Amino acid sequence: MAREFSLEKTRNIGIMAHIDAGKTTTTERILFYTGRIHKIGETHEGASQMDWMEQEQERGITITSAATTAQWKGYRVNIIDTPGHVDFTVEVERSLRVLDGAVAVLDAQSGVEPQTETVWRQATTYGVPRVVFVNKMDKIGADFLYSVGTLHERLAANAHPIQLPIGAEDTFEGIIDLIEMNALYYEDDLGNDPHIKEIPADLKDLADEYRGKLVEAVAELDEELMMKYLEGEEITKEELKAGIRKGTLNVEFYPVVCGTAFKNKGVQPMLDAVLDYLPAPTDVPAINGVLPDGEEAARHADDSEPFSSLAFKVMTDPYVGRLTFFRVYSGTLNSGSYVQNSTKGKRERVGRILQMHANHREEISIVYAGDIAAAVGLKDTTTGDTLCDEKEQIILESMEFPEPVIQVAIEPKSKADQDKMGQALAKLAEEDPTFRAETDQETGQTLISGMGELHLDILVDRMRREFRVEANVGDPQVSYRETFRKSAQVEGKFVRQSGGRGQYGHVWIEFGPNEEGKGFEFENAIVGGVVPREYIPAVQAGLEGALDNGVLAGYPLIDIKAKLYDGSYHDVDSNEMAFKVAASMALRNAAKKCDPVILEPMMAVEVVIPEEYLGDIMGNITSRRGRVDGMEARGNAQVVRAFVPLANMFGYATHLRSGTQGRGVYTMQFDHYEEVPKSIAEEIIKANGGNNKED
C-alpha cells in the first residue's frame, strides 16, 4: 500500500497550554473542521472527544495525551493533546519528545500563565518550534496585544502577531491577516465559511503598524531580507511567509494568531499556520541513537531507512487490552511482524496497528516514517523504549523522568480488593513512570508515591473506576531514618535455661558512625575463636535484621559500622538463633551510648516567581526550616534554589499558588538526609511511642 501523505505533507503537533486556556476545545474544533467529527463536543458539558477517560470528563481537565490523526488541505496532521496541570508534567514531557512542533494556546484575558511558562521551558529544552494561538477572544477582559506582551515579558520570546483581532469580548467578529492584508469575518455559528473583506477603516493604521513590525522582525533573522528591507524594497508575501517559516523552524521566531475555539472563530487560519510554519518530519534534525557496539548513529525520516521508533505511552484499553503508542522515526512497519525492543533486549510481535481518533480507532496494515500510531500485542514494552528492526538495532535517546516526591499509605477496603489492588497498582505503574507502588517492610502497608497530591488522587480514582478496587488512603508521610553520632563498645548477651537444651549467645560489638551514603558495614575482628566461625554470619544477619527497626522511633538505621571483637559461647547451648538475638540486643543497648539521631529527607527545591514576590517567598522558605542556596534571574523571573525538609513541603503548591496569584511554579526532588532538630525529633519519637525500650 503506497503512502497516502508524503513526509513533507505530514505534521506531528502537540497542543499545549495552561490548565483552562481552552486546549481541549481547540483540538475538538480542529477535528470538526478537518472532518473527523460531525458533532462538536463541549468540554464544559463533559462530552469532549479528546477527554475520553471518565475522570477527565468529570473534572474538565485532560490527564492523558490522546493521539489523534486529522486531514487538512491535503496534509495529515497528527495531534497530541497534552495536560496543562503541573502534576502531569511527565505527560507533557513525553509528548514533546515525539512531536515536531506545537501550538501554544493562551487565554486572551490572562496571557502567559505559570503552567505556560513550565511547558514553554520544556518545549525549549526539546527544541520544539511553536505557533501561538491566543484563544477565548470572546471572553470578558480579552486583550490580544496584552497577551502578546506577556510572551515578551514572561518568556522573553520573539513572538509577533501575523493576525490582529477585529473587536474583542462580545464584539469579536473576525481577524485581520497581516500577510495577505485582508479581513476574515465569521458570520455563521459554526464558522465554516468566513467571508474575506477589506480591512475596516478604523483598524487600517493599526494593521499597517503591525505589518511593519512583522516585516522588520522577520528581516532581522534573514540577511537577504534585511538587505532588501534596508534598501526600502518591497518584501513580497511569499518571501515574508518563507522568512516566518525559517525563523519558526529554527526556534527563533513564534508567529501569533488569534480566535475563539468555543465560538468557532479563527480555528481554520490557525490550522493553516500549522501547515505553513510548523515542521514536517523531514525539517527536524535526525534522531540520534546508539548501536549495539556503542557507536553513535542517526536515523533520518525516510521510509527506506531501517525501522526505528520510540514508545511514548502505554495505556490499558477496555476493548483491546494493552495499547502502546509509538512514533516512527525511520522505515516502515507491517502489522503482524516482529520488532526488537532494543532497550530491554527482547523480541516483540506487533499484533495489530491502530490509528487513533480520540476515542474511536481504525485498523491499518502499515505505518511509515513520521507516523504516530498504537500497537496491540506488545508485552514487555514500556514508556521510553526503542522498537526497531531486528537486523539493524539501535537504542534511541530515551526520556528522563523525575523521582516521585510524595508518598501515601493505601489499603484495600476488603479482602476481595486485596489481590485486585496489587494488579491495578502494577498496571498503573506500567503506564506512568513517575508512579511507584511498594510494600513498607516495617509496617506491611502498601505505599504509593507520585509527583503531587492531585497526581495520586487521580490514580486512586482510576483504580476505583477502571479496576473496581475500593481503597482507603492515608495522609502523606515522610520517610525518616536514624543513625549514630558516637562510637561505643556494647555487650549483647542472650541466655535461656529452661530444662533440657538452653540458648546461649554472647557478643561484644563496637558500633560507630559511617560516612554518609556508605550504608551498614560489618567487620569481624574475632581472634582465637571466642565466637566460633560458624556463628559470625548469624551475628551479621541479626544486626541487619535489627537495622530495619531503629532504636529511637523505629525508622531504619543507616550509615553505621559494627565491629564484632569479643564474646563467648557454650558447647551445647549456643546456636545461630541465640547469636542472632544477642546481636540485636547489642544494637538495642547501643541506643544509650552511641548518641542516636533522627534524619529527615531534604529536598532540593527550585521556585520560579515574578520578582515582586521574591521577599515573601524567601521568608516563607525560611519559615519552613529551609536554607536558600542560591538565586538567579531568568528572563524577568527570579529563580530561588533552596534545601527544605520534605516534612515542611506538604501543601506548598497551594501556598505558592495563592501567594503569587498562580504565577509561581516550583519543582522539588530528594537531595540528601540531614539531622532533625532536637525539639522535632522528640515529637517524632513521642508520636511513634518511643522505641528505646529494654528487650
Swiss-Prot record:
Gene Ontology terms for molecular function: GTP binding; GTPase activity; translation elongation factor activity
Gene that this polypeptide is encoded by: fusA
A Pfam family of this chain: GTP_EFTU_D2
Function of the molecule: Catalyzes the GTP-dependent ribosomal translocation step during translation elongation. During this step, the ribosome changes from the pre-translocational (PRE) to the post-translocational (POST) state as the newly formed A-site-bound peptidyl-tRNA and P-site-bound deacylated tRNA move to the P and E sites, respectively. Catalyzes the coordinated movement of the two tRNA molecules, the mRNA and conformational changes in the ribosome.
Subcellular localization: Cytoplasm
This protein's record includes keyword Nucleotide-binding: yes
Transmembrane segments: none
Family matches, as SMART domains: EFG_C (SM00838), EFG_IV (SM00889)
Residue ranges occupied by any tr-type G domain in the UniProt entry: 8-282
Organism from which the protein derives: Listeria monocytogenes serovar 1/2a (strain ATCC BAA-679 / EGD-e)
Residues that, per the record, bind GTP: 17-24, 81-85, 135-138
Family affiliation: Belongs to the TRAFAC class translation factor GTPase superfamily. Classic translation factor GTPase family. EF-G/EF-2 subfamily.
Protein known as: Elongation factor G
InterPro entries according to UniProt: EFG_II, EFG_III, EFG_III/V, EFG_IV, EFG_V, EFG_V-like, EFTu-like_2, G_TR_CS
Alphabetical list of HAMAP family matching this protein: EF_G_EF_2_B (MF_00054_B)
One GO biological process term: ribosome disassembly
